[in-house]
Swiss-Prot record:
Gene: betA
InterPro entries: BetA, FAD/NAD-bd_sf, GMC_OxRdtase, GMC_OxRdtase_N, GMC_OxRtase_C
Residues the entry annotates as binding FAD: 4-33
Pathway: Amine and polyamine biosynthesis; betaine biosynthesis via choline pathway; betaine aldehyde from choline (cytochrome c reductase route): step 1/1
Protein name: Oxygen-dependent choline dehydrogenase
Enzyme nomenclature, EC number: 1.1.99.1, 1.2.1.8
Length: 549
């Protein structure tokens, strides 16, 4: 089997690549995907988002190594093992990122990836329903919309932010990210709208695109050039040949793993694993970044939360409403209001993110208390902690070794303590007087730095946004893995295009910038002139130097 382009992975970036590389019919494309079908209610029903992430059928099920700053807990690190990749099992939250994120990328060596460069690609990919005119795309393949916003708690959260003196944004994916507002989701007509829905499924209708279900073992490199991918299917090993290029879009865990299995990575580590070194790139697997979060939970004194729908019977009712009529609670991920805030004066861009949920539940989906409640997922999104991904052995089937090294920087502790205290201030506003009951978590008695730190060590979890392990940068940067055109430095005919190439984590959920990366990488691969830079100026809080709001 052969094709002009062989793409490893059908996730957020891989699906976009398949769609764009095959668009004019001139190139043949093969997409390699180990995971199975994304058709089924657990994936397609937005409200069922917790199910696919917890099912081995759809999830690689990775765990970190014991994290020393989190009581040696092994942190769950899910990645999609299904058509559509993690876009088929994620929370469907749509956040482009802040303009400062991408300007920082360019400062770190990713020339041509500043905000003015990437904004046109966001517009190209979007079909925004109700976004800010002039800042949003309206005819792209990816449907983006707000939820029904019927629960009064969503509005109470936004009003509380206003009362606390914070900004309100009408569209955080438009000109102004900072503030409280309504959250956007990748859903359409009551269904999850994944990268597979938006990109891969339409691409597969073309005669020049083929999806191959298989396990990718390694990239074949001959005389310094990637010529194909060694795969395993049906108990046999074979090679899929690439006439032009191989593109790795396998996630921030599996992309560096594949490079290292293929002999591209830190030479000493590869030799330790018994792998012949094809290209000594010390940055492969390094620079691992992620967002962390905790749940801040409160009892609701009014029976307005989703608590009544948690019993199995009522979940069945909601499921039936969705299955037969595509209406009711099932059509939304239930994250329908949010906030993007700055942690202190002198911080130019938002660095704290809130997802508001009108129910108090634990990570396993069970009620956090035997009562109505509400919660926010709170995270400091610009952590300075860095981790790495390495090989466990030379066996392609072995899970990678994942060390996030969470909370290894003192500033992370300061910022997360602030998150706890700031959330108490927000929930203490008049807008919540009608609903506010006792604090469930962290708990009223958790007040001092030491008490908050103890809570964080036990309750911080990943927000499932790993990135950075195949860093994009200048060719003379020894830790860069790919150049600004996504070419692997030191190997011809090979690119990486997914969240692993982010030089620095973006502020917000990573599905949107991952898809954008696939969109932009496709133009580089095809040798097209990049889309014209935008001259639009995003809103920056004029008080940023002197106030946090």
């Amino acid at each position: 089997m052969q094709a002009d382009f062989v793409i490893i992975g059908s996730g957020s970036a891989g699906s976009a690549l398949a769609y764009r590389l095959s668009e004019d019919g001139a190139n043949s494309v093969v997409v390699l995907e180990f995971g199975g079908s994304d058709v089924g209610p657990f994936i397609q029903m937005p409200a069922a988002l917790a199910w696919p992430m917890s099912m081995n059928r759809y999830n690689w099920g990775y765990l970190s190594e014991p994290e020393p700053n989190l009581n040696n807990r092994r942190i769950t690190a899910p990645r999609g093992k299904v058509i559509g990749g993690s876009s088929s099992i994620n929370g469907m939250v749509y956040v482009r990122g802040h303009s400062e994120d991408f300007d920082r990328w360019e400062e770190l060596g990713a020339k041509g990836w500043a905000y003015a460069d990437v904004l046109p690609y966001y517009k190209r990919m979007e079909h925004s329903h109700g976004g800010e005119e002039g800042w949003r795309g309206t005819d792209g393949p990816l449907h983006v919309q707000r939820g029904p916003v019927k629960n009064p708690l969503f509005h109470a959260f936004i009003e509380a932010g206003k009362q606390a003196g914070f900004e309100v944004t009408e569209d955080y994916n438009g000109s102004k990210q900072e503030g409280f507002g309504l959250m956007e989701q990748t859903t359409w007509r009551g269904r999850r709208w994944s990268a597979a829905s938006a990109y891969l499924r339409p691409a597969l209708k073309r005669p020049n695109v083929e999806l191959v279900r298989c396990f990718a073992r390694k990239i074949v490199i001959e005389n310094g050039r990637a010529t194909g991918v060694e795969i395993e299917r049906g108990g046999r090993t074979e090679v899929v040949r690439a006439n032009r290029e191989v593109i790795v879009s396998a996630s921030s865990f599996n992309s560096p793993k594949l490079l290292m299995l293929s002999g591209i990575g830190p030479a000493a580590h590869l030799q330790e694993m018994g792998i012949d070194v094809k290209a000594d790139r010390p940055g492969v697997g390094q620079n691992l970044q992620d967002h962390m979060e905790f749940y801040f939970q409160q009892v609701s004194t009014k029976p307005v939360s989703l608590y009544s729908w948690l019993p199995w019977f009522w979940q069945g009712v909601a499921g039936a409403q969705w299955l037969f009529f595509k209406r009711g609670l099932g059509i939304s991920n239930q994250f329908e209001s949010c906030a993007f805030l700055r942690s202190a004066p002198g911080v130019k861009q938002p660095d704290i993110q809130y997802h508001f949920l009108p129910v108090a539940i634990s990570y396993d989906g069970k009620a956090a208390a035997k009562s109505h409640g509400f919660q926010v997922h709170v995270g400091y999104n610009l952590s300075k902690s860095r981790g790495d991904v390495t090989l466990r052995s030379s066996d392609p089937k072995a899970d990678p070794v994942i060390r996030f090294n969470y909370m290894s920087h003192p500033e992370d502790w300061e910022k997360f303590r602030h998150c706890v205290r700031l959330t108490r201030e927000i929930f203490g506003q008049k807008a919540f007087d009608l609903y506010r009951g006792p604090e469930i978590q962290p708990g009223e008695k958790v007040r001092t730095d030491e008490e908050i730190d103890a809570f964080l060590r036990e309750h911080l979890e990943s927000a499932y946004h790993p990135c950075g392990t195949c860093k994009m940068g200048a060719k003379d940067d020894p830790m860069a893995v790919v150049d600004p055109e996504t070419r692997v430095i030191g190997v011809d005919g090979l690119r990486v295009a997914d969240s692993s190439i982010f030089p620095h984590i973006t502020y917000g959920n990573l599905n949107a910038p991952s898809i954008m990366t696939g969109e932009k990488a496709a133009d580089h691969i095809l040798g097209k002139q990049p889309l014209a830079r935008s001259n639009q100026e995003p809103w920056i809080n004029p008080r940023w130097a002197v106030s946090d709001r």
